[in-house]
């Protein structure tokens, strides 16, 4: 059996004296797309941030390719380079005078460890290919200050794609996209997992899209209420356990 790209065992996170995430365990295999679903305040973003070392975890372990990750601080550069993370609210100062090409190129630069003039040809080609994949090549010369919300999301996704990764983590990345853009987005994720073997972990509120596109689902409401295939995890009884009976009744009548 192959080693999981990422494995989480008994992870618990506290905010002050309250456990926002408690005793969560799951594993991600290469070439799979896993969704985290649950109501607002369920701990979905907290779980992601604890895995990445942005938030401290009270207990539990996180393993990367079978090796335990430290509970102290952020991930090592070696691990970080293999993970792309697109948070729900990616805030940056739009007054920074850089173009989309320059923003995406930052994802190629090995966390600033390489000289900026090294491998310029490969760098330019990687940026071009990343922008092509998200249908944003025409935005390359645009200053980031001029981008719309949807264009900004495409540029940030290109930043994630500009170099090979093992894991892509997305927090409501498809929110705000129109129907065609959303379809293209999920087609891109399918290509990443099928052709390049990326593992994908995404937070989503769109249960219909999760059912259609994801391989596994984690149902979270502080605890991991269930996990499995979409057909199993999104069955009515499990949705009641995660969201409550009123939510399921609303979906049934709408």
What are these regions (language model features)?
Residues 37-39:
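The feature captures the beta-strand-to-loop junction immediately N-terminal to the Walker
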Residues 52:
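Helix-to-loop junction immediately C-terminal to a conserved catalytic motif
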Residues 60-71, 77-79:
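Conserved ABC transporter NBD signature motif
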Residues 105, 119-139:
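Conserved ABC ATPase "signature" region
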Residues 143-147, 151:
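Conserved ABC ATPase signature
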Residues 168-172:
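Catalytic Walker B motif of ABC-type/P-loop ATPase nucleotide-binding domains
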Residues 204-205:
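H-loop/switch region of ABC-family ATPase nucleotide-binding domains
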């Amino acid at each position: 059996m192959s080693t999981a790209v990422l494995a989480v065992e008994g992870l618990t996170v506290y905010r002050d004296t309250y456990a926002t995430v408690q005793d969560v365990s799951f594993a991600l295999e290469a070439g799979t797309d896993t969704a985290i679903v649950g109501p607002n305040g369920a701990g979905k973003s907290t779980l992601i941030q604890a895995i990445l070392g942005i938030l401290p975890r009270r207990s539990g372990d996180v393993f990367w390719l079978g090796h335990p990750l430290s509970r102290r601080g952020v991930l090592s550069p070696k691990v970080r380079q293999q993970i792309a993370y697109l948070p729900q609210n990616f805030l940056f100062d739009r007054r920074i005078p850089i173009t989309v090409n320059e923003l995406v190129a930052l994802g190629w630069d090995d966390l600033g460890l390489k000289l900026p003039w090294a491998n310029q040809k490969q760098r330019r080609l990687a940026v071009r290919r990343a922008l092509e994949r998200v249908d944003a090549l025409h935005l390359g010369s645009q200053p980031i200050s001029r981008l719309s919300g949807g264009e900004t999301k495409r540029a940030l996704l290109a930043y994630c794609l500009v170099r090979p990764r093992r894991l892509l983590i997305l927090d409501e990345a498809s929110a705000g996209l129109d129907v065609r853009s959303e379809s293209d987005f999920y087609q891109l994720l399918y290509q990443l997992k099928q052709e390049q073997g990326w593992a994908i972990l995404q937070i989503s509120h769109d249960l219909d899209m999760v059912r259609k596109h994801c391989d596994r689902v984690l149902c979270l409401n502080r605890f991991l209420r269930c996990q499995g295939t979409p057909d199993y995890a999104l069955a009515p009884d499990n949705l009641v356990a995660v969201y409550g009976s009123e939510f399921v009744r609303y979906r049934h009548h709408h």
